[in-house]
């Protein structure tokens, strides 16, 4: 192989250097022989001709002749004349070796691989034109492991399992292989995958990112409407006789019913205390005693009302789709007012209810207003009776509703008695 070819293939030759400097550096007797740099090693060593001869005569590895050939070309350029003469004699002995003829066919390929493995010492302009393949392998934190991999085989440094798949480069957002919120930690050449979420500290802030697992569930407008509708339905079922289905009417009737219940409770308390007072009178105890102390506010209020001759007063009203009942109690007098459609003879049935409640019926009046009949009953509470307004109204409504449904089923209506 010619000298010109050697100058072009060896990477350490500088074509821009002048000829005078090349000749002076090549034939200067005071300059020591050049040092050989081993790829992937941190130290350089000087080689002698004996080591070089032993290096060429080893037939075990096919890559050794290629290394020796490259070393010979480099010494031919930079060595002194004395070293050149000794080197030619050693090369003559090597060519006479029988094993050299068998291995010479592999020298050219090995030499080309060795040149490709050599470091590039060209100028920065040539480095800028070099395009390296994009590797998907992660970088190694330990430099010793990286040197071993680079010097072991050329296929390790040049082969990339994912390069032929032409995967796009990942954005520099701290993600690895497209997996979000994961980090890669290298510990003595071992890649450890761990979840970033487990290492985050709770700083008291509600994060609404993609990694948040807890999500607040807010009810929709449709669910709220269904919820309110169910609640109004339950409230309507608590009212004894609702008249309308709209929400405003349901709320109004519920308020009236609550007030009615409060009045009924007060009435019950007064009736109970009144019975106790009468029982004491029968046993001969003085009800009105200056030294008597009331055990409760109800008893005290009952005694005050009796001293002042206060009157018992209660009022209650019930409504349904076909009947309205109004009951008022003043002391021991009861007034019952009924308004109903012309379907049944309500006068007879209401009179039976008054008799069952132990009320003394004193007066009955009636009138016809359009398609409705109106009746007014005046009665008096018998002595010892504990009747109250809610009991009277509920009983009257129950009887009238039953008779009205029977009249509708039989399709037989009766006109109530009306007086002038």
UniProtKB/Swiss-Prot annotation:
One GO BP: anther wall tapetum development
Keywords, in A-Z order: DNA-binding, Nucleus, Transcription, Transcription regulation
Description of how the protein assembles with itself and partners: Homodimer.
Keyword presence, Transcription regulation: yes
bHLH domain location: 212-261
Principal location listed in the UniProt entry: nucleus
Feature: compositional bias, Basic residues: 207-216
GO molecular function: DNA-binding transcription factor activity; E-box binding; protein dimerization activity
Protein name: Transcription factor bHLH89
Localization (cell): Nucleus
GO cellular component: nucleus
Matching InterPro entries: bHLH91-like, bHLH_dom, HLH_DNA-bd_sf, MYC1-like_bHLH
The keyword Oxidoreductase belongs to this UniProt entry's keyword annotation: no
Superkingdom assignment: Eukaryota
Sequence segments annotated as region (Disordered): 196-216
Tissue expression: Flowers.
UniProt-listed Pfam families: HLH
